[in-house]
Curated annotation (Swiss-Prot):
Mg(2+) binds at residues 70, 140. CTP binds at residues 12, 147-149, 186-191, 222. It comes from Methanosarcina acetivorans (strain ATCC 35395 / DSM 2834 / JCM 12185 / C2A). Keywords: ATP-binding, Glutamine amidotransferase, Ligase, Magnesium, Metal-binding, Nucleotide-binding, Pyrimidine biosynthesis. This is CTP synthase.
Length: 534
């Protein structure tokens, strides 16, 4: 097994995840099987209970793992499927070590950070890498060098560097190069970051610099000199117009070839599919506008996978999608704001929890339904679409979800039976892959090209089966079902009115977009042309 370990310095949020995903993409283009592990030094067991404002979206894996959004980038760039074990946290490591101590696995020894915690970290990394069957395992250590939380993980990979043959492991350090008011790039923070890393016994073989503009030659020379790496291994990862261009920028600087040389990997394969996808993305001329009506709109990372899936749909349809975030509560506070939705070619209601903003979202759904604007609802978005339909078409006054109103006379959305009495929040929802059977002749079947699908879920509430017949008698169709569970709702006489209980965005890939997103963008393009022809 070959390991590429990536650390970060100066500040968090530099883009280590995109860097590691880009390196992995380039290695995959050379014919290698690549997997990736994200280490998060927080004490949480997983990301499932974190606020989107704290940590961005919670990405859901096929096995139900609720993980850091970087794993979403890994899956999209590498076109692979990971598991919950690919996300290590301090909480998971300590939980396992304490469980072993309670069982007596350590035979009465004093349990310490070294060797017990570090051994557990190394064991987890190696087991995940081996099970994946990959040629190369990428390991990203979250946070910033110098953070106390990261110390056990850095010590563990230091030991791995000592234990593995030199041709089996390489260290890459991602750091920030800032510019002063005159535009000169300052390397001192990067130098100090590498110095701090070296104090921990780690010497990076490659330094990747994050900057607004391409790294100047003088800055590259300084970093090479003071950080003791060859100048050709100081790589500029400057801001790109789109993250999918980053693998190409890194490739042009020869990093992939040099990594292969260090790791003694040989390949004559050259897959240009990624380059062709980026070329298609950059050559789009048509543009449409999408409104995402949500409650976490102040931080776009809260809806990262949705934004990427929309982009994938745009690439496939040959058009650029301009996304506008609309705060749902503003629609509640000022109904006049609803009229502003007329400028958009499509409306999307994403998933979420809690009652805040739900009435505003339903106003947006009503607008889309009544004005025949292409609409996509996801998870809570589907539930709210059903509530809106029940209230305004079926005339079930005060219909609601028991999540928001336990005393509603018409609980068209109710808690999953198995969720009744569940006390713990973490890892207890209906999570991960579940299948669905699609109705023949439905929009769902046309989008997917099959009547059997598997998609990822994250929810506690569902459409109440007791109301299905009554709702369908008024024109809504539940075209996807998992036994007696409603997975998809659509209104056939609309341009595009599609809502899913599952999260299709988590399986969307560049070059292989999620069918609902592909269909939404196609409908938006058609609607836009119809409006222009009026």
């Amino acid at each position: 097994m070959k390991y590429i370990v990536v650390t970060g310095g100066v500040m968090s949020g530099l883009g280590k995840g995109i860097t590691i995903a880009s390196i992995g993409r380039n290695l995959k283009n050379k014919g290698y099987k690549v997997t990736a592990i994200k280490i998060d030094p927080y004490i949480n067991i997983d990301a499932g209970t974190m606020s989107p404002y704290q940590h961005g979206e919670v990405f859901v894996l096929r096995d139900g793992g609720e993980v850091d959004l970087d794993l979403g980038n890994y899956e999209r760039f590498l076109d692979t499927e990971l598991t919950r074990d690919h996300n290590l946290t301090t909480g998971k490591i300590y939980q396992e070590v304490i469980a072993k101590e309670r069982r007596g696995d350590y035979l009465g020894k004093t349990v310490q950070i070294i060797p017990h915690i570090t051994n557990e970290i190394k064991s987890r990394i190696r087991k995940v890498a081996a099970r994946s069957g990959a040629d190369v395992c990428l390991v990203e250590i979250g946070g910033t060098v110098g953070d106390i939380e990261s110390m056990p993980f850095l010590e563990a990979v230091r030991q791995m560097h000592r234990e593995e043959p030199s041709e089996n492991i390489v260290f890459i350090h991602v750091t920030l190069v800032m510019e002063d008011l005159q535009g000169e790039q300052k390397t001192k923070p990067s130098q100090h970051s590498v110095k701090e890393l070296r104090a921990l016994g780690l010497s990076p073989e490659v330094i990747v610099t994050r900057s607004k503009t391409p790294l100047q030659e003088s800055a590259k020379e300084k970093i090479a000199l003071f950080c003791d790496v060859p100048q050709e291994l100081v790589i500029s990862a400057h801001d790109a117009a789109d993250i999918y261009e980053v693998p190409l920028e890194i490739e042009e600087q020869g990093l992939t070839t040099r990594l292969m040389k260090h790791l003694k990997l040989e390949s004559s394969v050259e897959d240009n599919g990624w380059r062709e996808m980026v070329s298609r993305m950059k050559s789009t001329t048509e543009e449409v506008k999408l409104a995402i009506v949500g409650k976490y709109t102040n931080l776009e990372d809260s809806y990262l996978s949705i934004l990427e899936a929309v982009k994938h749909g745009g690439i496939d349809n040959g058009c650029k999608v301009e996304v506008n975030m609309v705060e749902a509560e503003t629609l509640e506070e000022d109904p006049a704001e609803i009229e502003k939705l007329r400028q958009f070619d499509g409306i999307l209601i994403p998933g979420g929890f809690g009652g805040r903003g739900t009435e505003g979202k339903m106003l947006a759904i009503k607008f889309a339904r009544e004005n025949d604007v292409p609409f996509l609802g996801i998870c809570l978005g589907m539930q709210l679409a059903v509530i809106e339909f029940a209230r305004n078409v079926v005339n079930l006054e005060n219909a609601n979800s028991t999540e928001f109103d336990e005393d509603t006379p018409y609980p068209v959305i109710d808690i999953l039976p198995e969720q009744t009495g569940v006390a713990d929040m973490g890892g207890t929802m209906r999570l991960g892959d579940y299948d669905a059977i699609l109705k023949d002749g439905s929009l769902a079947t046309k989008l997917y090209g099959t009547n059997y699908i598997v998609e990822r879920h994250r929810h506690r509430y569902e459409v109440n089966p007791e109301f299905v017949d009554r709702l369908e008698s008024f024109g809504i169709v539940f075209s996807g079902k998992n036994k007696n569970r409603m997975e998809i709702a659509e209104i056939p006489d609309k341009r595009f009115f599609f809502a899913s209980q599952f999260h299709p965005e988590f399986r969307s890939r560049p070059g292989r977009p999620s069918p609902p997103f592909k269909g939404l963008v196609r409908a938006m393009c058609k609607y836009n042309k119809e409006k222009e022809g009026q």
